[in-house]
Amino acid sequence: MAVQRTFSIIKPDAVAKNVIGKITTRFEEAGLKIVASKIKQLSKAEAEGFYAEHSARGFFGDLVAFMTSGPVVVQVLEGENAIALNRELMGATNPKEAAPGTIRADFAESIDANAVHGSDSEAAAAREIAYFFAATEVTTR
């Protein structure tokens, strides 16, 4: 297995519930290292740009409104098979379908307010990391 980097967002619903530390602990206990992290309030333009691939879909406006409704935590996670591992930790997009013990099963309310985002491929991870972090902001641990 190769060491990979993946991108993670702890979304406004989870930040509002004050579970940033609990979610971060899940990443670290699974062997992922946090190599970049910042908390920020997304602007409408940032959210629209990040989710541009969904711009033609009916839920786009609601997604942008949700992602700008409060602060988020954007992170770069690093570890063996990081992309697949993070997706396993997150659980299914719909928390009602997420396996018990996953982040979404434990902390998410709905398919819209589903606590976390994670890259789904190496190409997406590279694009998403670069969207929020300069290369100089990502460390090696």
Swiss-Prot record:
Pfam families: NDK. Keywords: ATP-binding, Cytoplasm, Kinase, Magnesium, Metal-binding, Nucleotide metabolism, Nucleotide-binding, Phosphoprotein, Transferase. One of its GO terms (cellular component) is cytoplasm. It catalyses: a 2'-deoxyribonucleoside 5'-diphosphate + ATP = a 2'-deoxyribonucleoside 5'-triphosphate + ADP; a ribonucleoside 5'-diphosphate + ATP = a ribonucleoside 5'-triphosphate + ADP. ATP binds at K11, F59, R87, T93, R104, N114. The active site is at H117. One of its GO terms (molecular function) is ATP binding. Its EC number is 2.7.4.6. Its main location: cytoplasm. One of its GO terms (biological process) is GTP biosynthetic process. Homotetramer. This is Nucleoside diphosphate kinase. It comes from Pseudomonas entomophila (strain L48). The lineage of its organism: Bacteria, Pseudomonadati, Pseudomonadota, Gammaproteobacteria, Pseudomonadales.
